[in-house]
Amino acid sequence: MTRPLLSPEWVARLKQFKKLIVGFSGGLDSTVLLHVLASTPPLSNQLLAVHINHGISGNSLNWQRHCEQLCLDLGIAFIAKAIEFDRSANVEEAARNARYDFFSSLLEDNDCLVLGHHLDDQAETVLLQLFRGAGVDGLAAMQECSNLGAGQLARPFLTCPRVELEHYARIHELKWIEDESNQDTKYSRNYLRHRVMPLLLEKWPGVAGNISRAATHCQQAKANLEVLAIKDCPDLLNATDHLLIEPIKGLEFERITNVLKFWLKKNRIQLPSSKTFHRIIHEIIFAKLDAMPTVSWNQIQVRRFQQHLYLLKADQINLPKAIKWQQFPASLTYPDADIKLSAVKAQKGLMIPKDAQIEIRFRKGGEEIYWHGQTKHLKKLFQEWQIPPWVRDRVPLVYINDQLACVVGYAVSDLFFTTNPLEAWSIVNNS
């Protein structure tokens, strides 16, 4: 008697979620997964199948229609999404990132994304990471359960070999899509699947399970390293985009690297190379006190100001441009610069004259504001407020009729300040 693909433990675990979003490509793995979930009464009414149309194959629309029809037959809610991604570099990675970004955007609290990855997929992932020279994090490969966006990600088939999924599909006479690109060995995973794994299986029939078990050992080692990182630097528990340097300077090189890895992962940053970690430690952490060095990779920057490391992402590096706030007090958003301004009524604060022209600008140098009874240079105020230099260029400046009226989050000009709650506004940057 064959074991069920979905164990009672998995049924109990998945039953706790409000909604189960199934990544449904229409291939063997996701077709079996969807059928198993739809055939499990405690779970069948929680399902939403999501098909991602990458637009790579000429058959994409036919695949989408196939998936929609199967969901109609099973009585499962279905949505399809065509995604855009950069096709100039690593197509596999770019498509994967775009796919997970969309899945993440769908997840709400107590939702779970369920994917059909199986044991053979896990073995391939471990080998691909090994060939890239990955460390413990990479060799830990895919986890059965992890966080994703506001919800969770589950892979209930991760210990099931592909042959068990094929057996289930034959018994239930399921039809699935065969993506022709899966045979193209120019893609690394396909090369491994069609050229390398058959040789390994010929010599060691149980090799996929053994490799997968090694990933489990690496996951435990990864968890232990994360515990060590918090022990070495308790500030990690509260750290966001900045990290105090002093507590880690006395650690050994490897343990500093471990702390940095934890910090970057917490901020959802793909880990850089060992060479980059070496540069962060030697060029930034152990730099002179008055130095402000920078290390960059993949549109990410790590910088230093005073006794802190600062992490900057792409939308924090791009400098925003001036824009008129024509719909004041409606919110104003800079989608490419991680800035969202809102105006809220206040007991005291910024006064906006009737029919005023409001414009949001950013520092270029030479700005002055009349504040606390004096005309002050904005540059000196930024220094007094101990704002890191690269942040200064991104602090929104509210100009009213061409006069600097407010430095958002820091100061309101005396010329535009009021204590009348009927007239006062507070400008808030919600980024």
Curated annotation (Swiss-Prot):
The lineage of its organism: Bacteria, Pseudomonadati, Pseudomonadota, Gammaproteobacteria, Legionellales. GO terms for cellular component: cytoplasm. The N-terminal region contains the highly conserved SGGXDS motif, predicted to be a P-loop motif involved in ATP binding. ATP binds at residues 25-30. SMART domains: TilS_C (SM00977). The gene is tilS. One of its GO terms (molecular function) is tRNA(Ile)-lysidine synthase activity. It is found in: Cytoplasm. It holds the Pfam family TilS_C. It comes from Legionella pneumophila (strain Paris). It is an enzyme of class 6 (ligase). This is tRNA(Ile)-lysidine synthase.
